[in-house]
């Protein structure tokens, strides 16, 4: 397919997903579909609605906005409470969807969104932390920091503190990124480990470093996007902190790029083991790289030369995994459904573990990032 054909196909693909989804039954939330349980406030839908709102900002097409508003309004009540959301669960994943409330509040001015923003902020006020001050990923994972959590919570936290709290928590957010760099970055590759256990008690944690054993692509992807999204929400008056995260972003993109597959432009599920039996070129993490770089270039955080790396990743993913079914419907494949550490399934962070998780089509953990990158491609064409 030509690049133009891919972009046209993606426009049709979003229409297809929206037409077949609602807040009660989002077709892109494969975990929910498989569970058969009612939908609840979650980060997966949050990622998809963020993409829809980004497409609205880029194209001005009201269908993306009206769908997003209806979706969020299913959960957000007039008093600012959020159906199915419990702040005391202390799960950073649940903060992610909160980013979309800022956008809807700015567009519609409805105070229920402002109240709901405060509801989510209340979680972070008492979210348990490591001794060094990083949010625990979840209350059920004590003393643990996961890369995923930076994307889930830090952009919301930075925006709230910048807009509504006189920047009081902004340096706290910055310090959490610096702690992650200190503990989770591998000096040899420049890649970051998926998880870190400050207590060194978990079976997956290295007894010396506290880190999990491998570099999972999507975790790296969430982390790269987190830095871009935090910079976007950060006041440049925080001169040293702003430049500190920008330098961390640039170095990370340079280091990650070294692992880009030359032929396809994609990245491997476990990044530093290309071609190993069981490993595969994975959609979601590749799309997150493309989005982080394209947005970083547009906003001036990254040099323009990096855009070519992102475009190669974006179009390479579409060539590899975007296809039409015989009935004309579209699908995006190559998406790792889920990966974590610990828990009841004894997830040990080994290569065998990361290779064993299901690979699915049309899940928002891959679709959302690809559509965010698509919105950036469209925005770049307008400039």
Regions found by a protein language model. Give the residues of each.
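Inter-helical turn/loop segments and adjacent helix faces that build the functional surface
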Residues: 59, 108, 160-171, 230-243, ...
């Amino acid at each position: 397919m030509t690049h133009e054909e891919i972009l046209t196909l993606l426009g049709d693909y979003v229409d297809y997903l929206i037409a077949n989804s609602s807040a009660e039954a989002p077709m892109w939330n494969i975990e929910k579909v498989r569970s058969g349980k009612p939908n609840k406030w979650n980060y997966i839908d949050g990622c998809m609605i963020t993409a829809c709102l980004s497409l609205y900002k880029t194209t001005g097409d009201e269908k993306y906005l009206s769908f997003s508003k209806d979706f969020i309004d299913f959960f957000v009540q007039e008093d600012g409470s959020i159906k199915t959301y419990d702040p005391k669960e202390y799960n950073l994943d649940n903060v992610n969807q909160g980013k979309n409330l800022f956008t809807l509040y700015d567009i519609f001015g409805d105070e229920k969104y402002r109240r709901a923003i405060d509801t989510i902020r209340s979680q972070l006020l008492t979210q348990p932390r490591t001794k060094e001050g990083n949010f625990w990923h979840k209350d059920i994972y004590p003393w643990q920091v996961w890369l995923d959590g930076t994307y889930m919570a830090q952009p919301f936290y930075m925006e709230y503190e910048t807009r509504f709290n006189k920047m009081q928590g902004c340096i706290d957010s910055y310090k959490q990124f610096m702690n992650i760099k200190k503990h989770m970055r591998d000096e040899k590759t420049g890649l970051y480990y998926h998880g870190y256990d400050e207590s060194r008690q978990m079976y997956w944690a290295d007894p010396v470093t506290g880190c999990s054993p491998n570099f999972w692509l999507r975790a790296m992807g969430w982390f790269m996007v987190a830095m871009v999204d935090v910079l976007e929400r950060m006041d440049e008056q925080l001169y040293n902190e702003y430049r500190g995260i920008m330098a961390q972003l640039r170095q990370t993109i340079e280091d990650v790029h070294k692992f880009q597959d030359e032929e396809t432009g994609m990245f491997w599920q476990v990044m530093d083991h290309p071609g190993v039996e069981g490993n595969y070129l994975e959609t979601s993490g590749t799309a997150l790289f493309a989005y982080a770089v394209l947005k970083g270039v547009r906003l001036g955080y990254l040099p323009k030369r990096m855009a070519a790396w992102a475009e190669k990743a974006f179009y390479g993913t579409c060539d590899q995994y975007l296809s039409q079914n015989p009935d004309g419907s579209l699908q995006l494949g190559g998406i790792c459904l889920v990966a974590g550490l610990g828990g009841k399934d004894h997830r040990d962070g080994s290569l065998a573990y990361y290779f064993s998780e299901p690979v699915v089509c049309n899940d928002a953990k891959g679709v959302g990032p690809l559509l965010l990158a698509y919105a950036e491609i469209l925005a770049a064409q307008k400039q």
